[in-house]
Amino acid sequence: MARYRGAVERLERRFGVSLALKGERRLSGKSALDKRAYGPGQHGQRRAKTSDYGLQLKEKQKAKMMYGISEKQFRSIFVEANRLDGNTGENLIRLIERRLDNVVYRMGFATTRSSARQLVTHGHVLVDGKRLDIPSYFVRSGQKIEIKEKTKSNPQVVRAMELTAQTGIVPWIDVEKDKKYGIFTRYPEREEVVVPIEERLIVELYSK
């Protein structure tokens, strides 16, 4: 499945939750979801009954859209999560959170995961001092993620850091804002990852 390129705020209204797809509008409270917290279209305010399969599929789609992951990548991550010891659903969220594009977003260097992905693919991100342009790379504990020197003064990066000051940084990451780098100190616990996703439904879907 190709990445969604349609109206992202319409998508958020369909799922009924913020997917963090519109950074500045989301933080300012001006997103379409803030104004109209119901589905798009003529019958958007009606709540149609959904089957168990429909709920499971919707949850997977929501997670893929939120993190900007293709079906092939998502399934690959699930297979790895299922291989690891522990709860498969929790493993799934932890693995997704370790993706380089997501870590760049979590460090506050971009207002959306999509913008963070562009920083990575365009070669603006260093991992342990070396350029890495693979958004799906799994960051390990202790690794240093840095914005390339020439990009540190980029207005979009600077603005993203200003906006992040309103929301704070997640506890498994340390960031030196002035120097535009951060350390992925440890893997997150599931309860620390605040995302509107019921991973149990995704596990049920893939387990059929």
Curated annotation (Swiss-Prot):
Database matches in InterPro entries: Ribosomal_uS4, Ribosomal_uS4_bac-type, Ribosomal_uS4_CS, Ribosomal_uS4_N, S4_RNA-bd, S4_RNA-bd_sf
Keywords, comma-separated and alphabetical: Ribonucleoprotein, Ribosomal protein, RNA-binding, rRNA-binding
The UniProt record lists the keyword RNA-binding: yes
UniProt GO cellular component terms: small ribosomal subunit
Domain S4 RNA-binding, first and last residues per copy: 98-161
One Gene Ontology term of the molecular function aspect: rRNA binding
UniProt-listed GO biological process terms: ribosomal small subunit biogenesis; translation
Keyword RNA-binding among UniProt keywords: yes
Reported function: One of the primary rRNA binding proteins, it binds directly to 16S rRNA where it nucleates assembly of the body of the 30S subunit. With S5 and S12 plays an important role in translational accuracy.
Matches recorded under PANTHER family: 30S 40S RIBOSOMAL PROTEIN, SMALL RIBOSOMAL SUBUNIT PROTEIN US4M
Protein family (similarity comment): Belongs to the universal ribosomal protein uS4 family.
Oligomeric form and interacting partners: Part of the 30S ribosomal subunit. Contacts protein S5. The interaction surface between S4 and S5 is involved in control of translational fidelity.
Name of protein: Small ribosomal subunit protein uS4
Organism whose genome encodes this protein: Helicobacter pylori (strain G27)
Lineage of origin: Bacteria, Pseudomonadati, Campylobacterota, Epsilonproteobacteria, Campylobacterales
Gene: rpsD
